[in-house]
Each structure stands twice: as C-alpha cells, then as structure tokens.
Amino acid sequence: MGLEVAADSVASALAAQAGGAMRVELCGGLDGGGLTPSFGTLAVVRERLRIPLYVLIRPRVGDFVFDAAEVEVMRRDVEQCVRLGCDGVVLGALDRHGQVDLATMRVLMQAAGSLGVTFHRAIDVSADPSRVLEDAIALGCERVLTSGARASALEGIDTIAALVRQAAGRIGIMPGAGLSEHNIRALRQHTGAHEFHASARGVIAAQVPSPHPYIRDLGGDYQRTDTARVQRMVDALQQA
C-alpha cells in the first residue's frame, strides 16, 4: 500500500521522494490536467530520483481521441522514456465512441516494451468505465487511475469501490483527484484500494513581486509538492 505523487518539476519529484511516496508520476502542466513533461525535466528527474518513475504521455489538453500525428508523437515520447530508463508510462486513448482505442494503445504499449503501464483518467470520461477496465486488463496494464468518473475521488468513492470489486486482483485500481491527508484514510477503508494518487501541493510565493498584478499568467505564485503533506498522507494510509 502506498502513495503515488503527481509531480510537474524536479523539485516536486524530489519532495515526493523525501515525503515517503512510493512512486512519482512525472508530468508537465499539472494545472491543466497534466501533459508529457519536457525532455530536460524528465532527464534530470531520472538522474536524481531513487524511487520508481512513471511518465505521463499526453501531447495536449482536451479529449483523449488522438489523430495519427499525435499517436506518433506519443510513441516517440514513450521510446524516450525507455531510453532514459524510466520504470513505466501512463497512457490512455479513446475512440470517438468513448471506448478504448485499442489500436493506439497497442502501438504505445509495444513501444513501451517491458515498462509498466498505468491506464490514466481517460476511463473517467469514457462511455463505460467497466468495459474500459476489462480492456485495460486485456491490454496488460498494471493499474487504472480513476476518480470514479466524478470530479473527485471522494465523490466517486462508490464507483471506485465497484471497480475494485470488478478487478478482483487482476489489475490495480488507484484512486486519484482531490485526495488529501483529510480523506485518504476514508477512501482506503471504503474502496479497499491499495495505491493512491495525489499531487500533495502547497503554494510557493513568488520571489519577485510583479509590478503588473493584472498579468496573472506570467510570474506570481505557483504550486509545488509539499514534503510534509506527502508524509502526512503516507502516515494516514499506514494507519488505515
């Protein structure tokens, strides 16, 4: 049982490790739901991290229906993860009917080779999460990250519990979205899940005050994984 931390910087990844996370999911643009991280970020994190590193492969924001060019971008990103010695990748692709795009997933998983694969929250916007779960099992994914098709895992707690029962040990079900030190124990007890996913972030104040506060997307405060929050969440899990 343990906590995977979503990190979008070197500092966040190392903070997750220091707090006792069992694994890091590295991404970029976490505030937009997460994108594939930059090569530089990935390379430096791989060099410095001692715990397992999984990498989100998502070329853009928006839905999870990808065209041929986007699939090629993702395939090359997966290959880069293999070359850098990452432990796994986080994937997900749907077709226009809201079902798993099996052809795309097979291309990406073939590129991943022996790397572990997590099927991400595309399941939460699919037409049938139960069917997506079976497809993820058939594809050979290790786990599915899900909020139970709701805005937060706490809201989707009953669906997550049902997916855990359906999985019956064939694949991991990892609750994510809105997890904190205040609710992770309840999620563990109600769902029976063994792995949990959170960013565990806190606000970092801007080092240089902006002379133009009306320009909100440049400069200013930002968020970073908080080691103490990670530790509190890990402790809460151990007490569950």
Curated annotation (Swiss-Prot):
<protein>
    <recommendedName>
        <fullName>PF03932 family protein CutC</fullName>
    </recommendedName>
</protein>
<dbReference type="InterPro" id="IPR036822">
    <property type="entry name" value="CutC-like_dom_sf"/>
</dbReference>
<dbReference type="Pfam" id="PF03932">
    <property type="entry name" value="CutC"/>
</dbReference>
<comment type="similarity">
    <text>Belongs to the CutC family.</text>
</comment>
<keyword id="KW-0963">Cytoplasm</keyword>
<dbReference type="InterPro" id="IPR005627">
    <property type="entry name" value="CutC-like"/>
</dbReference>
<dbReference type="GO" id="GO:0005507">
    <property type="term" value="F:copper ion binding"/>
</dbReference>
<dbReference type="GO" id="GO:0005737">
    <property type="term" value="C:cytoplasm"/>
</dbReference>
